[in-house]
Design a protein with these regions (language model features):
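Compositionally biased, low-complexity flexible segments
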Residues: 45-49
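Active-site microenvironments in enzyme catalytic cores
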Residues: 2-24, 36-37, 54, 90-279
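Gly/serine-rich nucleotide phosphate-binding loop at the start of the catalytic core
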Residues: 13, 17-37, 41, 51-101
Length: 279
């Protein structure tokens, strides 16, 4: 079971600038009597009633700079707008509102099984940005995708397909520069033997595989529950490096992410990539 406590933070975490989205709860002021809690100002019969007691204020864009916390929401509204500012780090002290935030307590309250929804907890650090992914980024990944394709998503056949692929192709493709003359010669040889694959095309060909992983705001935060399509019997968690990129293409930050992939679905057809990835 995932446990996030003070040991989840490296000792030097205060030495830098960090971006977070934090669910910040707040109290709902009793604008109307407790037994008639219609939305203030709405006199229509049957108007929607908010739940009684505390209500969440929603996600906040939070900056952590040199160990201090700042709320960037009043200045920018969203993390996306903040990262597209001219100087996102410089804006922290100029425009951020200093707040008292115990990051260790927020971390401890973040896993779904230990969460108190009336206390702050971490969300995914992005909001309005498109979530893109790069596939077949190294040799092992490329060979695994070829294996998926050759066993047609059948996990029981994966071991035999893996041995077959490695015997024929080998593991030394890392020395080949994608799109080079050597790569094109290898492609011709593989095509002649009937071993060419769309995954090899993006692995050693001229163009990389870059696709939309999911829609904005579909990502979930640390320790949150994830959804896996019930039709899949072979899914993989994939720890990956994630980059925060602004609209000008500048890399502003890095984090770790979990790219859950339905291997049996993707192995049936590359045209099912969206179904295999967006889950």
């Amino acid at each position: 079971m995932l446990r996030l406590d003070e040991h989840a933070l490296p000792a030097d975490w205060p030495n830098g600038a960090h971006v977070a989205r934090v669910h910040m709860p707040a109290e709902l002021p009793p604008a109307v009597p407790i037994n008639d809690r219609r939305i203030p100002g709405d006199r229509r019969a049957g108007a929607p009633r908010p739940p009684e007691g505390p209500l969440p204020a929603g996600p906040s864009a939070i900056a952590l700079l040199d160990g201090a916390a700042f709320d960037m929401t009043p200045a920018f509204g969203t993390v996306g707008a903040w990262l597209n500012a001219e100087d996102p780090v410089g804006a922290i002290r100029r425009k951020g509102v200093p707040i008292a935030l115990d990051l260790r307590a927020v971390l401890a309250n973040t896993p779904h099984h230990a969460r108190d929804p009336l206390k702050p907890y971490l969300l995914a650090p992005i909001d309005l940005q498109a979530v893109k992914a790069c596939g077949v980024t190294y040799v092992r990944s490329m060979l695994e995708r070829v294996i998926e394709e050759r066993c047609h998503g059948d996990a029981a056949r994966a071991a035999a397909a893996r041995a077959e692929v490695r015997e024929f192709i080998g593991d030394d493709l890392a020395a080949i520069r994608p799109g080079s003359a050597e790569a094109l010669r290898l492609k011709d040889a593989l095509v002649a033997k009937g071993w060419w694959s769309g995954y090899l095309e993006v692995g050693i060909g001229a163009d990389a595989e870059i696709f939309t992983k999911c829609q904005p705001m579909a990502a979930v935060g640390t320790g949150a529950r994830i959804g896996v399509h019930p039709a899949s019997q072979w899914s993989n968690p994939e720890p990956e490096a994630v980059l925060a990129v602004n609209a000008q293409g500048a890399i502003l930050g890095a984090m770790l992410g979990n790219d859950v992939n339905l291997r049996d679905v993707e192995g049936r057809s590359a045209l099912l990539l969206g179904r295999a990835k967006d889950n």
